[in-house]
Amino acid sequence: MKTLETRKEKKAQGKVLKAFGNLLQVTFEGNIRQGEVAMVHVDNLQLKSEVIEILGNQAKIQVFEDTKGVRLGSLVSFTGDLLEAELGPGLLSSIFDGLQNPLVDVADQAGLFLPKGIYLSALDRQRKWDFESSAKVGDVLFRGDRIGSTKEGRFHHFIMVPFSLYGKYRLTWVINSGSYTVDTVVAKAIDESGQEHSFTMVQKWPVKNALIHGEKIKPTKMMDTGERIIDTQFPLMKGGTFCTPGPFGAGKTVLQHHLSKYAAVDIVLFVACGERAGEVVEVLREFPHLIDPHTDEALMKRTVIICNTSSMPVAARESSIYMGITIAEYYRQMGLDVLVLADSTSRWAQALREMSGRLEEIPGEEAFPAYLSSRIAEFYERSGVVSLRHGKPGSITIGGAVSPAGGNFEEPVTQATLSVVGAFLGLSRARSDSRRYPAIDPLLSWSKYVDTVGNELSHQVDGWDQMVKRARHILFNGNEIGKRMEVVGEEGISMEDMLTYLKAELYDFSYLQQNAFDKEDAYCPLKRQIALFQLINQIFDTTFDFHTHDQAREFFLDLQNRIKNMNFISFDTEQYRKVFAEIKSIIEQQSRK
């Protein structure tokens, strides 16, 4: 029988031979394996590290902490375990670092400045959970099958047979329903060889291995984000992937925060990987006070935050990315829709570059390792929809922010990401400088899900996909005419071209741009988007007759301001309906002149 359980043999020991930053070369006795966790003894502390290269009786390990104090001959003890995530009830509403230490508990124990060498349990060992058993004695179970469940917020958190166990297990004992801690044995079973196994509410899984049990199926459902430019022009799907590259200050982090607040998913994993501490603090301050628009509950109840700021050790950036996706995979196996937001994958790639340089590997483009593309693809491939034996499928949607230096989309990290994602939401400096937020460039960005989502929305609105294509076409034409106007002026273009340009500007200003700090405009539900988009298309369809360019400009400026102001009014209220009717009346009056 195949198992991933900890090996019982004597654990290896070693000593430090060389130190190069957080890369240590050690000599060891015993058996170790790639990815194994090792503890480096420094004074009275033990620093967590990971084996990244083995050659004979020597190994190279990367330490997840500052290596100040490590000296020649320092003792290294190998644990026999891979770097693992602790999975069980209590993960939601938590704030972890890249090694899954609960930062609130660390702060209570060590104060405001995080010392090195402190590792705490990810789950609260004292808290009791109301466990309700669903399996019976005599049932034959496989990995991932449900033993029972407990209530975690508004979700049923299913207690499953550990994914590290393979083969058949026959239940011999199940605990009565009641309140228990996560370490309480809730069931016992025997495997095919007659060996007994005890199951608690906690299980562990190596973060570098994909946790998946079930068949991957094609994404079919749209992920509603409440962001008009995304849902209409560049839609996302549950189980899909997308990236948001852009220069510094273009609004990547604000966009990621918006998605974590308003995306129509069950659970959000926010991985702040190498972000500035100020931005992480903003998330930690803001999120506990925000309300989920879909459930009217606190947003933190569906959120897990993993913080690894730019001031923390570089090696932990990699572990934070993998830790986040592993927790997401665990919740996917319960049939939940999960959104993973990594901000920013560029900082993770920089950590790979730094370690690759210390390992003296042959560099690729811009000194990034040659295997950069495969690592990025590996991460995004852990997304997807999985068909489960118990009810509805679960999904993971991955969105990665990319921070190319100077907004250069030709650099290796952006190019490696673009080759594997399903949607590209490119933020441009030109749009952010002209205060056109969100600064997603409608001329650069693309989505592979446009046709699938278009077919889905065409059931609600006839010809939705054609309307979207025409709006994009008008945007392109308006942009070309705008460039011509810069050279020849307004007088040098025809009235027809002038109207196309003004329609494109109205669509951009009134529909694609959105105020993230306004209560009403921050989140635009799909029903409201459809009503507004139909109004915009009515303007596209209307034939206007103006005598001068100035007259046309004056009319369209007034019209776009009216539509913009309507976006700040609560949807479907008496005031909204009144303003909506006034706008339609103005359009009809002008078309009859």
From Swiss-Prot:
Annotated binding of ATP, by residue: G246, P247, F248, G249, A250, G251, K252, T253
SUPFAM superfamilies from the UniProt entry: C-terminal domain of alpha and beta subunits of F1 ATP synthase, P-loop containing nucleoside triphosphate hydrolases
Domain of life: Bacteria
InterPro entries (UniProt xref): ATP-synt_VA_C, ATP-synth_a_Xtn, ATPase_a/bsu_AS, ATPase_F1/V1/A1_a/bsu_N, ATPase_F1/V1/A1_a/bsu_nucl-bd, ATPase_F1/V1_b/a_C, P-loop_NTPase, V-ATPase_asu
PROSITE patterns, per database record: ATPASE_ALPHA_BETA
Keyword set, alphabetical order: ATP synthesis, ATP-binding, Hydrogen ion transport, Ion transport, Nucleotide-binding, Translocase, Transport
SS bond list: none
Pfam families tied to this protein: ATP-synt_ab, ATP-synt_ab_N, ATP-synt_ab_Xtn, ATP-synt_VA_C
A biological process from GO: proton motive force-driven plasma membrane ATP synthesis
Top EC class, one word: translocase
Catalysis performed (reactions): ATP + H2O + 4 H(+)(in) = ADP + phosphate + 5 H(+)(out)
Family: Belongs to the ATPase alpha/beta chains family.
Described purpose of this protein according to its UniProt entry: Produces ATP from ADP in the presence of a proton gradient across the membrane. The V-type alpha chain is a catalytic subunit.
Cross-referenced NCBIfam families: PRK04192.1 (NF003220)
Protein name, entry field: V-type ATP synthase alpha chain
Biological source species: Protochlamydia amoebophila (strain UWE25)
